[in-house]
Amino acid sequence: MIRISDAAQAHFAKLLANQEEGTQIRVFVINPGTPNAECGVSYCPPDAVEDTDTALKFEQLTAYVDELSAPYLEDAEIDFVTDQLGSQLTLKAPNAKMRKVSDDAPLMERVEYLLQSQINPQLAGHGGRVSLMEITDDGLAILQFGGGCNGCSMVDVTLKEGIEKQLLNEFPELKGVRDLTEHQRGEHSYY
């Protein structure tokens, strides 16, 4: 479910050494399955462990996950990275905003999952997002851009070199990708 690197385990063990005896960590998702989902890690004293929690035992600690957060933390990774600028704890949870779909799910669900878990996080850095509107009978994924992508001059490159390549590589049953967005600068433009 969750992978915690050795460096992150050592970091947590150091922090836990200063806490009440038996205190471990809790990994959770607030607003799971929504675009506003946020992941977090907190201390989990012994009296805060619930019967429905999943206990993930690691070499140096135990991480508790509540029942509601568990499916959204599938494939999550926690790491502690040190570089020239300092140290940073990172928590990557690709399924926090949307539950992972099975390989045999309908094509529409699988494409939507890839857009939400892999492509939109990249576009979000520029204030943008993309939505799947439909998949046509002839295998075209019809997308609509929003936010910072609406009216962006690089949208054609993003669509053809980024999104289309990734979708066609992942889903051979797709024949192409089309953009439904009106990109001429106007009242609807983001900037």
From Swiss-Prot:
Required cofactor(s): [4Fe-4S] cluster
Annotated family: Belongs to the NfuA family.
SUPFAM superfamilies: Fe-S cluster assembly (FSCA) domain-like (SSF117916), HesB-like domain (SSF89360)
Any Pfam family: NifU
Protein name: Fe/S biogenesis protein NfuA
Function: Involved in iron-sulfur cluster biogenesis. Binds a 4Fe-4S cluster, can transfer this cluster to apoproteins, and thereby intervenes in the maturation of Fe/S proteins. Could also act as a scaffold/chaperone for damaged Fe/S proteins.
InterPro entries, per the entry: Fe/S_biogenesis_protein_NfuA (IPR017726), FeS_biogenesis (IPR000361), FSCA_dom_sf (IPR034904), HesB-like_dom_sf (IPR035903), NIF_FeS_clus_asmbl_NifU_C (IPR001075)
This protein's record includes keyword Metal-binding: yes
The species this protein was found in: Klebsiella pneumoniae subsp. pneumoniae (strain ATCC 700721 / MGH 78578)
Gene coding for it: nfuA
Residues reported in the UniProt entry to bind [4Fe-4S] cluster: 149, 152
Keyword entries, A-Z: 4Fe-4S, Iron, Iron-sulfur, Metal-binding
Description of how the protein assembles with itself and partners: Homodimer.
Entry note: cofactor: Binds 1 [4Fe-4S] cluster per subunit. The cluster is presumably bound at the interface of two monomers.
